[in-house]
Amino acid sequence: MKKKQLKPEPYMMNRELSWLKFNERVLNEAGNPRVPLAERLTFASIYQSNLDEFYMVRVGTLMDQMESSEVVRENKTNMTSKEQVKAIIDATRELDIKKAVIYEQLMGELEPQGIRIINFNKLSGKEGELLETYFDNEIAPYLSANIISKQQPFPFLQNKEIYAVALLATKGGKTKTAIIPCSNNVFKRLIDIPTRPGTFMLSEELILHFLPKLFKKYEIKEKSLLRITRNADIDTETIYDEDMDYRDAMENLVKQRKRMNPVRMEFSRKINKKLIAEICKYIHMDKNHVFMSRVPLDLSFVFAIQNYLRMQGAEKEKLFYQKRSPRMTPQLKEKESLIAQIEQKDVLLSYPFENIKSFTNLLYEAARDDSVVSIKMTLYRLAVRSQIVDALVEAAENGKEVVVLVELRARFDEESNIEYSRKLEEAGCRVIYGLSGLKVHSKLCLITRKTEKGLEYITQIGTGNYNEKTSTLYTDLSLITAKQEIGKEAAEVFACLLRGETIEETHVLLVAPKCLQNKVLDMIDDEICHAKNREEAYIGIKINSLTDKVIIEKL
């Protein structure tokens, strides 16, 4: 007997397709004439990097599910993993068309500003000679050209790196495949044309043009640039083993991610279908995941264009947003004790408008304050040179008890967090790594002081990471309070984390997985009740995404 399939709710949308709609709005900003031109370049690059990560994580997850013997269905639209992947690919192809149109618009609008990205066929004879000399001296010595054979198997293609691929023909008519890595830190990606200031050529296009110099014995029948995106959905639950060090196991798992199966392949030109099929066979990828791109395969070069524009003087400032720096909050007097001020009143910091330095200064003050006995904190994503970590290290070196939960499973920040966990441990901090089956995404800090009144708490609860860089970019709130009922409950949260447990009951804090959804539902019910009684009722929610079906239905 077949299992009855549930019909999708008409007001719900598939999570993955909803995300693609969000990323389309990012792309729309790249085409928005009301946005300064140089900033539109940023939006174009963000759109592409967002899509890369989406394929690495979300499509990677769906493809893992497709390999399972059990059919997994999405709980809102009842779509299978296979149906979702097909819908994603179809939507991506439509977005690729839109991306190409917007890219051409951007390039056209850059020309009056003195910026051009050109191909070799747009160069004069003299310019071509100059670039040939540049290629011979600055690029060719660093290239490793591979002709695929029994002696030289198909090379491993790195995630998101650009390669030149060519179909070669011998004098006898036999064909061979060649692969050349085009990404190298030794030579520049954006090559300037000396005779034309503001005119550039991408290094991979120069490599593609001069392939005949690398394969002198062959005729180049077909050539293109290619780029693959690999699955990055590592299964961290496999490393929970009493007999192995969790951090070392996580480090090994992150290394394995670099060799996971590809989920997408992009070409810069239409090429022979047999060659595409051959490459797909080599890398074990479905040909339906192959895309043809009319724009450069990696748009990160736009930041070099922005730097060039900034160097052109004040007249180009109109192409950028007016620079705004976070201010120090007027709620606190920075030259006076922050602890004493917070004891008198709560402080709500609003990023990026206010500076996270007020919080880092509080941590440094706590590290040096004799009344502070402990600092406990959860860390998810940190800045490259983290003042937060430095303050915690100083606190530990000053004899404070410092307990830090470092979430090693913060995707793409695993290696950074592994290094920070070592630094904290070496300073004398107690470092823990979270709970099996659950990521600790909370942003919670608890400062405990021993005073004449007994133990007193200062608690910080935030919506954003403890990251000095992203706090200048993302809108987040950070509450710092001396309310003891909040501090006591935060202390219980940390006690549970240290025991490897989730908190079962809370009164003032909303803590997933057991004390968040039910409290949100209660608050929604309260507003429904107010509305039914013709009283003032309002629900305002600011979140990155909403996928909880129960809450969606309640709303």
Which stretches of residues belong to each language-model region?
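N-terminal localization/anchoring segments of enzymes in phospholipid and broader phosphate metabolism
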Residues: 1-539, 548, 554
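Short, small/polar-rich loop/turn modules that mediate ligand/substrate recognition or access, typified
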Residues: 543
